[in-house]
Swiss-Prot record:
The lineage of its organism: Archaea, Thermoproteota, Thermoprotei, Thermoproteales, Thermoproteaceae. Pfam families: UPF0179 (PF03684). Residues 145-157 have a biased composition (Low complexity). Residues 142-167 are annotated as: Disordered. This is UPF0179 protein PAE0681. It comes from the Archaea. Belongs to the UPF0179 family. HAMAP family: UPF0179 (MF_00498). InterPro entries: UPF0179.
Length: 167
């Protein structure tokens, strides 16, 4: 998956450490380190540290703690999808069909976002419907038109090469 260089606290700078960004504090947005720190991460997403780089002595404006450059990759989200959309490798539009069910990832994924299912890990029944418990990645933001068309790729991508998903 996509790798990004960002800054984390010295305590978090350990290969294998996982963390989730719940929100970005307002104080961060005025910091000179924001573009290489929180500015590279998305709220609601989980990340895993895959490489630690040498510290350059940067300090956090909020905690005054030492910040260390690391390479992170987005960790998959675990959530519910209707059984008819739960196929490994498929890209679908998240429609919040599981709203109100425990395990529904609506706090992490917005209606209309494209997600790529990477693994099916189980099944769950909620509100009279069957859902698959899946691991997935968010691959694109919701379309500006607010379209709720569910799409799966059945043929070659028409997207320009720079916008195609990499396997």
């Amino acid at each position: 998956m996509r790798r990004v260089v960002t800054l984390v606290s010295k305590e978090q700078a350990e290969v294998g450490h996982r963390f989730r960004v719940f929100s970005i504090p307002e104080e961060c947005k005025d910091c000179r380190l924001y573009p290489v720190c929180m500015g590279r991460l998305a709220p609601g997403r989980s990340y895993k540290v895959v490489e630690v780089r040498p510290s350059m002595g940067q300090r956090c404006k909020i905690t005054d703690g030492e910040m260390v450059p690391v390479v992170v990759e987005e960790a998959p989200v675990i959530g519910l999808l209707p059984l008819n959309k739960a196929l490994e490798g498929v890209v679908v539009t998240f429609e919040e069909e599981c709203a109100g069910c425990e395990g529904c990832p609506s706090d992490v994924v917005k209606k209309g976002e494209k997600i790529k299912v990477v693994k099916i890990v189980g099944r769950k029944r909620c509100r009279g419907r069957e859902f698959a418990i899946v691991e997935f990645y968010v691959v694109s933001p919701p379309s500006p038109s607010g379209s709720s068309i569910s799409a799966t790729s059945q043929g070659p991508s028409r997207a320009p090469p720079s916008r195609r998903l990499l396997k």
